Amino acid sequence: MQVLVRDNNVDQALKALKKKMQREGIFREMKLRGHYEKPSEKKAREKAEAVRRARKLARKKLQREGLLPMKPKPAFGAERGRPGAGGPGAGGPGAGPRGPR
């Protein structure tokens, strides 16, 4: 895999490399090959992935046909983890430990 470095801008080249690797699925492959996966576990994982893909395809089809509402786009800054976004795990004033469990 090749990435051009323009004007000695290594940060931009690294960003482009990570994007290419993500698109090619290299990170996912590395994670899967990080430890041995039993054939039965591999089969179960692949089956679950196929079910997930089929559900997603069916959901998209229903949305296109107008039988399901389209997923609303989040308001600007309302993404999870952004400052001032609110919601679970967002922090903010009064955010502290959850307390005893």
Curated annotation (Swiss-Prot):
GO molecular function: structural constituent of ribosome
Annotated GO CC locations: ribonucleoprotein complex; ribosome
One GO-annotated biological process of the protein: translation
Gly residues composition-biased segments: 83-101
Pfam families: Ribosomal_S21
Comp. bias regions, Basic and acidic residues: 36-52
Domain of life: Bacteria
Keywords: Ribonucleoprotein, Ribosomal protein
Composition skew (Basic residues), residue ranges: 53-62
Region spans: Disordered: 36-101
Ribonucleoprotein listed as a keyword: yes
NCBIfam families reported in the protein's UniProt record: S21p
Family the UniProt entry places it in: Belongs to the bacterial ribosomal protein bS21 family.
Protein name, per record: Small ribosomal subunit protein bS21
Species assigned in the record: Rhodopseudomonas palustris (strain HaA2)
Taxonomic lineage: Bacteria, Pseudomonadati, Pseudomonadota, Alphaproteobacteria, Hyphomicrobiales
